[in-house]
Amino acid sequence: MGTTILAENGLLLQIALLSQFTVNGVGLITQTLVGNFKGKGESERIMPVLYTSIVHGLLISLPFAVLSVLFPVTVFGLLTSHIEVSYSIHAYVIWLVPLLSLTAVAFVLEGYFIGLKEGAILRNSALTALGMGYAPIAIAGWYFQSNHLLWTSLTIYMATLMFSLSLQILKNQQNYQSSLGQT
């Protein structure tokens, strides 16, 4: 794929990491509040925290992606002095929109399950996302030397993780509702 694509991927990952470190704060807040509400037995307050955290995570992550897509030469020009990289990155910068959106939601959902002390759910969801989402497409990306497939694999990993954790939330909510009906 070449050194230019390697440099472009490095720059795109810098934006992704900047967004993720920022959104991780929302995940930590979610973790703390969910854990506190669970400990106090105030389970009815957990879902509003989750919804609010997801919205705020997206509000934080999307500007990173949108600004990078709309002004790639300016944004990436701040990160590198190699003009050819700043000008050719436009082919891959669009991947930041789905990747950062999915990552924001996944980080918040991880915070939710950490707050509930459900480490097994996190582990199983991450392994599922790795095996079913990331690995097959990443292997194809390596085999075909396709950078778009590599970005697809990372995006699908986050989508699979988010979907898997979301299914567990629905299951938890059904269990919670049925326990309310029994009391």
Task: Specify the residue positions occupied by each region the protein language model found.
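Short extramembrane helix-to-coil loop segments that connect adjacent transmembrane helices in Major
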Residues: 1-5
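Small-residue-rich hydrophobic transmembrane alpha-helices
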Residues: 8-66, 70, 106-117, 121
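Alpha-helical transmembrane segments of multi-pass membrane proteins
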Residues: 17-19, 83-109, 135
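Short runs within selected transmembrane alpha-helices of multi-pass transporters and secretion channels
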Residues: 24-27, 96-115, 121-133, 148-166
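Short alpha-helical transmembrane segments in multi-pass integral membrane proteins
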Residues: 34-99, 140-183
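Hydrophobic alpha-helical transmembrane segments in multi-pass integral membrane proteins
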Residues: 133-141
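Transmembrane helix-bundle signature of multi-pass membrane transporters/permeases
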Residues: 10-17, 53-54, 93-96, 126-130, ...
